[in-house]
A protein has these predicted regions:
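Viral RNA-dependent RNA polymerase
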Residues: 1-345
């Protein structure tokens, strides 16, 4: 438990969020003295209208939600800061006590993907930069209105692309930047996966203030699209058969179909007790919605997903014949769980 000038310090998002987990609090007084300083200090774009009271009448739960508040503040003597919330989240470190279970599950997923993709797996080849910018049959074109990310504060992706959406071209200075990164990768230097934190402008539950998300740098995004988008397309094309769900409609029968397919697969391997539990969860009701809470923060599990992708790449004709491309893919996947986060400004 920590105090500054007799006031408790916590991040305001959770009652369990006192700062006892922080190793160094020498600068916390400076932070607490500038409660109005935050990069997203502008007000939310949401505002209440005359329809709000009507919405509460129809759906009483509406009153449990509110417009986000982006400013750090002191309420009832408690300093609430999104910076601290983000630090707390990033300080949570998981540890796998028995790795054999995860490796067995990874091997099962790998075999399942190989069986269902079959020879289609050999379609997987890196995209050209033109394909990345324009998009393909299943992937969207680059969103040129979104942030360019680190280190180009305040700039949009539109600042690095010229031409129409049908014929986009990277500007020369940025194309040279990508070329330089790839040349460094060929010397064994991984690309940098650098994210900056920002606050989501979305309606949130009362007491939560707002949500923090990570905005990645565009260079790394382009590399991920070049080398991983073709595999994601294969996953999407076979999403009715795979447990790897990209672009799945989470609301509706498709989610239930996924669970039923998983149930059918578990039938072959489960113990009687596991079957009884799984059947009670899946078979006796229709599931129309689902979410994996904070899955993107569980970097321990990401390690195994990365290995599955490497195993799949090692089977393909292209990556067998192009050792340099396989080495680049390895460095990109390695950077996926060795990222740098810049909190606030």
């Amino acid at each position: 438990y920590c105090e500054v000038n007799g006031k408790p310090i916590r991040d305001g998002l959770s009652k369990k969020s006192e700062c006892k987990h922080l190793p160094d609090l020498t600068n916390i007084g400076i932070l607490a003295g500038h409660v109005d300083r935050w990069s997203n200090s502008s007000p939310s774009n949401f505002y209440k209208t005359a329809l709000y009271d009507r919405a509460v009448e129809l759906i009483p739960e509406t009153k449990n939600y509110e417009i986000p508040d982006f400013k750090a503040k002191v309420v009832d003597g408690v300093y609430s800061s999104h910076n601290l919330a983000c630090i707390r989240q990033m300080s949570n470190i998981g540890k796998v006590m028995n790795e054999s279970v995860f490796w067995s599950a990874s091997e099962m997923v790998y075999n399942h993907v190989v069986i269902n993709l079959g020879d289609d797996l050999h379609i997987w080849e890196p995209l050209s930069i033109d394909q990345v910018l324009k998009g393909t049959d299943l992937t969207n074109p680059l969103n040129r209105k979104s942030s360019l990310g680190f280190p180009f504060s305040g700039q949009k992706k539109d600042d690095i692309v010229t031409g129409s959406y049908d014929k986009p071209v990277l500007k020369a200075w940025y194309a040279n930047r990508i070329r330089m990164i790839i040349e460094r990768m060929d010397k064994g230097l991984p690309p940098l996966n650098i994210s900056t934190t920002a606050l989501k402008d979305e309606i949130v539950k009362k007491g939560k203030n707002s949500r923090v998300f990570f905005s990645g740098n565009t260079e790394f995004l382009l590399l991920c699209r070049m080398y991983l988008a073709p595999l994601m397309e294969l996953f999407m094309a076979k999403r009715d058969k795979l447990f790897a769900k990209i672009g799945m409609n989470a609301i509706g029968k498709e989610f239930d179909d996924m669970l039923q397919n998983m149930y059918a697969h578990v039938l072959k391997h489960a113990t009687p007790d596991e079957l009884k539990l799984f059947k009670s969860i899946v078979s006796d009701r229709l599931w129309i919605d689902g979410d994996y809470s904070k899955y993107d923060k569980l970097l321990v599990t990401l390690r195994y997903a990365i290995h599955i992708i490497l195993w799949l790449a090692a089977r393909t004709k292209h990556f067998k014949q192009n050792v340099l491309d396989f080495a680049r893919l390895y460095l990109i996947l390695k950077a996926l769980h060795e990222y740098v986060v810049i909190i606030g400004q």
